[in-house]
Amino acid sequence: VIIDENDQITSNEIHHITPSKTLPWWYEYYKRIRLFPWWTRYNIGLTKEASHKDKILELAAKMNFDKRATSKIIRHAVSEFSKHGLGSDYPGYHTINHNLEVAFISLLSAGNQKVENKIPDKDIKNLFVAALFHDFDPRKEFEKPNEDNIELFIRNDEKLGKLIHSFGIDLNIVIALIHRTTYPFAGAQKEHALKRMHELYSLAGIQQDDINTRRHYEKLGLYLSICDRIAGYCLGDFNYAKELARRNARGIGWHSQVINEKSVEFFSGLKQKDDKDTFERVIHSLPIAFRKNFFDNVEGFREAWEKELEIKASLRKKEINLVTSLENIIDVKNKITKDMCDMIMKIRYEYCSPTNFYDRDFRKSLYDSSTILITLRINSKIGEIVGYVKGGPLEKHKPKYGLYEENLGKMNSGHMESLRRGTNDQNLGKMNSIFMEWIAIRTGYLGEKGGHMLRSEFLKEARRRGYSYVTSYSQRELITNRKNKGEPIEIVQQYDAAMIDYYRIDLSQFVESIPIN
């Protein structure tokens, strides 16, 4: 947008933010081919996204939306998100599934408002379309979308422009609502979003002195923001809520050890002065079952945080101590017991779906002599297990294809128990590398050096067994910090959006530190 000296819009030229990286020309075709099995299931109604679509179409019919136009724009959203890498196989939070959830909750809530709060049909359409595309940033550098880039992609999509026009709404208003979903809506982010929103109001023909209309759309944007923040937590149980929180943590930048604490703060923010009234409007317009889900999940995070505080206090008072134990899988006389296996599986279920298709493979690997299994225990090497790390030869961790967990809307390998599809390692087949799966620690014991202890013991055991390299996935920031501290670690393959990169540690250069325990 071109602004004159008086800060007034003088041209309809759009606000351009260039994406950081251009994807290869073949990428969309590759994604379409790879997602063909998923598309087949989607088209016959066997995916979670298809279920959301059906519910949205049912609501839209009651609101006298054009059924064909609604169906087309949903299909376009699903197609665009999927072929740009934000579909069912994307490990982050801001997926097409999330956008469909927000669209569904927005429609449901808007249609159930009391007479005094009734939302006009045109505004409901604005809400719906903005909800569908509010996270559409396929070339983002970070997991969290950039609203300026979202605007760019939406404006450059001619087909979407025609679909939006068929709803009889203004594209500029839709984009203004999307800018209001910026989170957290504070500081420089808030200033930037508000400035752009008012520019868009002017592009939509709303005069500068028409304060009431501008304020009306600001409130509508806040309504969308509330729906965005609570949608997923209204639609599932606490296991689903924990999965959403873990995914969302990556986008917002929370460390895994503060997820419960930050989740409590996240939900408490809905009760703050600026958001409280709108939150009450939204939550009380939803069915009882959805309200119960939401408040049960909020209480679940609060109880988990309180339990965390109790455990951390005991650890810091030295009432309990953490120790690591190498489970002797190689010794036939001392293989892990069924009780130990069940406890490890229980901890694993805090990170993966209990209906995980790979349960059998995981259990089998626990009894494999090539597996390294380190447990984190309380007080002694025979104490209660509160965490573990496991891994094995790289060759036994090849990508798993074609399986997708509909209940949680994620790949079962989301906990990084195998190589991600698309990861290429030059050492695969050389039998010189061991893959370390993600560390799993029970809620409450995170952040008390347990993860460091498990990782250190795993690296030492890998070197003792003659491996040259340890590979795994981690957040880019953590990899960089370790490298800066002198660890012989390198990023082998970057994943720009989620920033969960594949790395390699050279064990020949690894200097053993003094054991913490």
Task: Give the role of each language-model region.
Residues 99, 106, 126, 147-203:
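Histidine- and acidic-residue-rich, metal-dependent catalytic cores
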Residues 58-59, 317-361, 368, 374-385:
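Short amphipathic alpha-helix that is part of the acyltransferase structural core
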Residues 438-441, 447-462:
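Conserved acetyl-CoA-binding loop-helix of GNAT-fold acetyltransferases
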Residues 73-105, 137:
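Active-site flanking loop/helix segments enriched in acidic
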Residues 381-438:
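Conserved acyl-donor/pantetheine-binding loop and adjacent beta-alpha core of acyl/acetyltransferases
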Residues 2-62, 92-94, 105-121, 133, ...:
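Divalent metal-dependent phosphate-bond-processing catalytic cores, especially two-metal-ion Mg2+/Mn2+ enzymes
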Residues 311-336, 354-355, 440, 460-517:
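Terminal substrate-recognition subdomain of acyl/acetyltransferases
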